[in-house]
């Protein structure tokens, strides 16, 4: 399929997509919010009063959902290389979290307190070549895992988008090394042909606490 045909198919699907329509009606910035909502409803992993870090937050729909879930007593810190239009109640930090200065700034926003949830919906710029895209994605997942290990409370949750392919099984095993519970989810809002799945990890193992 040519890039032109692929773009046309994407546009047709986008226009007719119920999640796109629902997101617009509900005021969310992206259909991706329904991937998060489905797993939150199932696993109850964001609660009132929680502190949440949202990595790769643009355009902001996950942060919108997270701030609703944590309420005024909680905190949501969003980070992305891209700018995000302001969202009420969200602390936004623009920059590359793989850089030490940005990572330290993230921790400063938490007032150096441990957080309850780390979200990551990060994806690299897609080239269309799985042999290039998947390793880039796995690298970002590993960096997000590192932040989760260093910033989560012992009972905290790490929720991350992962693409199935080379390195997937190894990443899952890495998460199982650090967390007591790891589950894989394929939300209904995730397109069937997409290789993306979402991993939810919970409860850092005592020996792995930073």
Curated annotation (Swiss-Prot):
InterPro entries: RNA_methyltr_RlmE, RNA_MeTrfase_FtsJ_dom, rRNA-MeTfrase_E, SAM-dependent_MTases_sf. The keyword Transferase applies. S-adenosyl-L-methionine binds at residues 60, 62, 80, 96, 121. Keywords: Cytoplasm, Methyltransferase, rRNA processing, S-adenosyl-L-methionine, Transferase. The active site is at 161 (proton acceptor). One of its GO terms (cellular component) is cytoplasm. Its main location: cytoplasm. The keyword Transcription regulation does not apply. Its EC number is 2.1.1.166. It is found in: Cytoplasm. GO terms for molecular function: rRNA (uridine-2'-O-)-methyltransferase activity. It catalyses: uridine(2552) in 23S rRNA + S-adenosyl-L-methionine = 2'-O-methyluridine(2552) in 23S rRNA + S-adenosyl-L-homocysteine + H(+). Pfam families: FtsJ. Belongs to the class I-like SAM-binding methyltransferase superfamily. RNA methyltransferase RlmE family. PANTHER family: RIBOSOMAL RNA METHYLTRANSFERASE, RRNA METHYLTRANSFERASE 2, MITOCHONDRIAL. NCBIfam families: PRK11188.1. Specifically methylates the uridine in position 2552 of 23S rRNA at the 2'-O position of the ribose in the fully assembled 50S ribosomal subunit. This is Ribosomal RNA large subunit methyltransferase E. It comes from Vesicomyosocius okutanii subsp. Calyptogena okutanii (strain HA). The lineage of its organism: Bacteria, Pseudomonadati, Pseudomonadota, Gammaproteobacteria, Candidatus Pseudothioglobaceae. The gene is rlmE.
